Amino acid sequence: MTIDRIYPIFTVRWLAIHGLAVPTVFFLGSISAMQFIQR
């Protein structure tokens, strides 16, 4: 029963981290690409 309580929290936390990390990496990559093209 303890695993059932911890597992959903870990899954939501994992999805939240990746949901924020993926757009952040894409945003930083696009900014670095624009700066590289301008130079």
Curated annotation (Swiss-Prot):
PROSITE patterns assigned to the protein according to its UniProt record, in alphabetical order: CYTOCHROME_B559 (PS00537)
Keywords: Chloroplast, Electron transport, Heme, Iron, Membrane, Metal-binding, Photosynthesis, Photosystem II, Plastid, Thylakoid, Transmembrane, Transmembrane helix, Transport
Chain ranges passing through the membrane: 14-30
Subcellular location: Plastid, Chloroplast thylakoid membrane
Keyword Iron belongs to the record: yes
Assembly information from the UniProt record: Heterodimer of an alpha subunit and a beta subunit. PSII is composed of 1 copy each of membrane proteins PsbA, PsbB, PsbC, PsbD, PsbE, PsbF, PsbH, PsbI, PsbJ, PsbK, PsbL, PsbM, PsbT, PsbX, PsbY, PsbZ, Psb30/Ycf12, at least 3 peripheral proteins of the oxygen-evolving complex and a large number of cofactors. It forms dimeric complexes.
Membrane topology: Single-pass membrane protein
Protein name: Cytochrome b559 subunit beta
Organism: Ephedra sinica (Chinese ephedra)
Cofactor: heme b
One GO MF term attached to the UniProt entry: heme binding
Record bears the keyword Nucleotide-binding: no
Family: Belongs to the PsbE/PsbF family.
NCBIfam families: cyt_b559_beta
